[in-house]
């Protein structure tokens, strides 16, 4: 008996401790700072609420039935031959079907509305940032500003940002949790992602796909500046850097595998560097396909250069 009381007390203590510890957690997905993130949170909470319509009654009934039909309750109705109830059948089938239908319609609409490659409707002209996943760092190119950075980006708040994403190594995943969707980065291909920050701040960016021993340190900072003037100042700071990215040799030097990299800025970036990074894998594919049968080689060749805008995932 004492052991049972001890275990019960320990269980309540563990529950309380877990609640206190979890209260200190800062969930980026549930505290978004961008329009896409807000809409995704709304979808998550709506789906969660709908599922509770089934879960909560099921839990209550499980507890209630166990209490009502406990061995010590001599007043409980005993029905050993009970096997069917039209009312019960109607409830257990109708409610889940209605929930599934509602979720199906909701998911269909939001999936298309939050399509990552779909440009955001906004009065401000979008900022274009080209993203290259490396081992194990993030390389960012600003084609309009003529600069590049490692593990840091900046853009004005309340201004759409178009991310063009590829990889210089294995498949990876580009993700700024507080702003919204993640997108895959794949060598020789380009994926597109559109995000916006509703307020100024510095947000954590991560790699959401395991890519090797340096994966855990593959993080970056996304700075949403208060206005365009602050963004221009950040650009000017990058342009003052003595580091340059004038050719592919300089790019390959930066792309050398390394872990826990510091922020770097580059001025005088080679034009069309992003396209060249994609192109070097496409050329490699051509040479590799030369050993394949002619028909198979032609099929692969026809796929080269495709924009994977519709191959990404939004979640």
Feature roles, as predicted:
Residues 1-27:
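N-terminal secretory/membrane targeting signals
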Residues 10-13, 44, 49, 90:
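Hydrophobic alpha-helical transmembrane segments
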Residues 16-20, 52, 56, 93, ...:
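Alpha-helical transmembrane spans of integral membrane proteins, capturing the lipid-embedded, hydrophobic core
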Residues 17-22, 45, 51, 83:
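Generic secretory/membrane-interface signal
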Residues 20, 61-64, 106-109:
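Transmembrane alpha-helix boundary/anchor motif
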Residues 26-43, 68-315:
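Non-transmembrane, membrane-proximal soluble domains of secreted or membrane proteins
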Residues 40-57:
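Alpha-helical transmembrane segments
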Residues 57-72:
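Membrane-water interface of transmembrane alpha-helices
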């Amino acid at each position: 008996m004492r052991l049972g009381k001890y275990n019960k007390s320990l269980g309540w203590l563990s529950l309380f401790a877990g609640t206190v510890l979890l209260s200190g957690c800062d969930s980026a997905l549930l505290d978004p700072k961008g329009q896409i993130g807000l809409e995704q949170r709304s979808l998550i909470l709506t789906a969660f609420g709908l599922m509770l319509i089934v879960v909560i009654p099921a839990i209550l009934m499980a507890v209630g039935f166990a209490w009502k039909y406990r061995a010590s309750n001599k007043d409980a109705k005993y029905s050993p031959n009970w096997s069917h109830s039209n009312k019960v059948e109607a409830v257990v089938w109708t409610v889940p079907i209605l929930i599934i239908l509602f979720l199906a319609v909701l998911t269909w609409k939001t999936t298309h509305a939050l399509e990552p490659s779909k440009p955001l409707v906004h009065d401000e002209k979008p900022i274009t940032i080209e993203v290259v996943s490396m081992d194990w760092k993030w390389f960012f190119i600003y084609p309009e500003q003529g600069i590049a950075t490692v593990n840091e980006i900046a853009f004005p708040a309340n201004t759409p940002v178009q991310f063009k994403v590829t990889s210089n190594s294995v498949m990876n995943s580009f993700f700024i949790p507080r702003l919204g969707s993640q997108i895959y980065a794949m060598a020789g291909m380009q994926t597109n992602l559109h995000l916006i920050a509703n307020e100024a701040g510095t947000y954590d960016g991560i790699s959401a796909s395991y890519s090797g021993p340096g994966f855990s340190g593959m993080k970056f900072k996304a700075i949403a500046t208060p206005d365009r003037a602050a963004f221009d100042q950040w650009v000017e700071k990058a342009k003052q850097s003595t580091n340059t990215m004038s050719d592919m040799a300089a790019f390959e030097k930066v792309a050398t595998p390394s872990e826990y990299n510091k922020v770097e800025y580059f001025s005088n970036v080679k034009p069309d560097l992003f396209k060249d990074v994609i192109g070097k894998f496409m050329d490699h594919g051509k040479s590799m396909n030369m050993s394949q049968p002619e028909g198979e080689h032609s099929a692969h060749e026809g796929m080269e250069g495709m924009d994977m805008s519709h191959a990404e995932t939004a979640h």
